Amino acid sequence: MFHQAVLDGLRPTEENPFKLLRVKPRETVKRAIDRNTIRRMAELELSHKPHLELARDLYLFSFFSRGMSFVDIVFLKRSRQEIDYYRKKTKQRLRIGLTPQLSALINKYDNNTEYVFPILNPNSPKPLYKQYRLALERVNRNLKQVGRMLGIETKLTTYVARHSWATQARRSGAPMAVISEGLGHTSEETTRIYLQKFDQSILDKVNEQLSEL
């Protein structure tokens, strides 16, 4: 859990007792969903299942906020003018203008804490990081149920929203530099590698076109 806290940006790297240990990460298949599926997700009537409604709304908020990471959403504090925060992972400052979609989601969860969404309880004896990790597991579990309701094969997680924003931005013709800035990456090379790993559908489409002799 300590190592994960460092990766999430909630503990400084110099405190990590495993920082000298080099373990090659297991490569996972990155997935994204298209805009039509996201639209259907937004239109789902979930008021009778508030736990699924919150999970869905957190996914949409991530997509509408340029793929904001779940950890940053959880710790995001209220602001009237724009979204202004520092990424936990890179400490980079990001600013996002409030669109009607973002404003609607923020106003929907007008809770009594300084945070945008009702996830963290500052008065709880449970550490905030522990609350965040439990929320991540819970939301991802609920998102999988939302995915089944939509009838899609992709296993929805909070991270799929980030992948989806990057994919749709690329397909819309956005320059790599713009996508990199939007995601809060420290370099375009990071974004290039990031996109390359899950943009399989574009490659398949090109290959199909070239195969039609």
Task: Please name every model-derived segment.
Residues 1-16, 68:
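N-terminal DNA-binding recognition helix of tyrosine site-specific recombinases/integrases
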Residues 20, 75-108:
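Conserved tyrosine-mediated DNA breakage-rejoining catalytic core shared by Y-recombinases
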Residues 24-54:
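Long, amphipathic, Lys/Arg-enriched alpha-helical "connector/arm" segment
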Residues 32, 87-91, 183-208:
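Catalytic-site neighborhood detector that most strongly recognizes the C-terminal catalytic loop/helix
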Residues 38, 99-153:
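Active-site/catalytic core of tyrosine-dependent DNA strand-transfer enzymes
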Residues 43, 47-50, 140-181:
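Short, basic (Lys/Arg/His-rich) helix/loop patches that form interaction surfaces
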Residues 78-82, 152-154, 174-193:
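Short, polar N-cap/turn motifs at the start of nucleic acid-interacting alpha helices
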Residues 97-100, 104, 108-109, 196-213:
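DNA/chromatin major-groove-contacting recognition/catalytic segments
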